[in-house]
Swiss-Prot record:
Presence of the UniProt keyword Iron in the record: yes
PROSITE patterns on file: 4FE4S_FER_1, 4FE4S_FER_2
Subunit structure: NDH-1 is composed of 14 different subunits. Subunits NuoA, H, J, K, L, M, N constitute the membrane sector of the complex.
Highest rank taxon of the organism: Bacteria
Annotated gene: nuoI2
UniProt main location, coarse: membrane
Keyword vocabulary terms for this entry: 4Fe-4S, Cell inner membrane, Cell membrane, Iron, Iron-sulfur, Membrane, Metal-binding, NAD, Quinone, Repeat, Translocase, Ubiquinone
InterPro entries in UniProt: 4Fe4S_Fe-S-bd, 4Fe4S_Fe_S_CS, NADH_quinone_OxRdtase_chainI
Protein's recorded name: NADH-quinone oxidoreductase subunit I 2
Cofactor note: Binds 2 [4Fe-4S] clusters per subunit.
4Fe-4S ferredoxin-type domain sequence ranges: 49-82, 93-122
Species this chain originates from: Solibacter usitatus (strain Ellin6076)
GO function terms (MF aspect): 4 iron, 4 sulfur cluster binding; iron ion binding; NADH:ubiquinone reductase (non-electrogenic) activity; quinone binding
Taxonomy of the source species: Bacteria, Pseudomonadati, Acidobacteriota, Terriglobia, Bryobacterales
Amino acid sequence: MIELLKKIFLVDLFQGLFVTFRNQNPKYIYTEQYPAERPKVAERYRGAPRLNINPDNGETLCISCNLCALACPENLIVVTSERSEVTKRKELVTFTYDTSRCMFCGLCEDACPVDALELTQDFEMASYTREGQIWDRQALEEGPRPTQYKC
């Protein structure tokens, strides 16, 4: 009879809820207001890639050495270049970076001799399509554009 009353009045449920609420102190509960307030990320966080440009002339710093593509364990960086007739240097033609396969290890950033490739602290890289995750040279130079929400 006692077991039946315990099942009817949900005694076990209330005992479990008591244990849960006893260990939750409301003054320690913290909720981030994410879209309105951007969270602070760690200083060494590696996020969205960016191709740096020279502020003096607006050209990319990439010298098309292909070391970043060779250092990448996922083979997601594709660099193509052509030799210039005038300067006799390799000039960057295309640079693609597949962020959907990237594990953000930073080996490509370390391999770059001129610091042209950088992993920034931007973390908003969501896309509705797989093609949106493959960034070309223009997207890498501009960097991700975080959505500004108004509350």
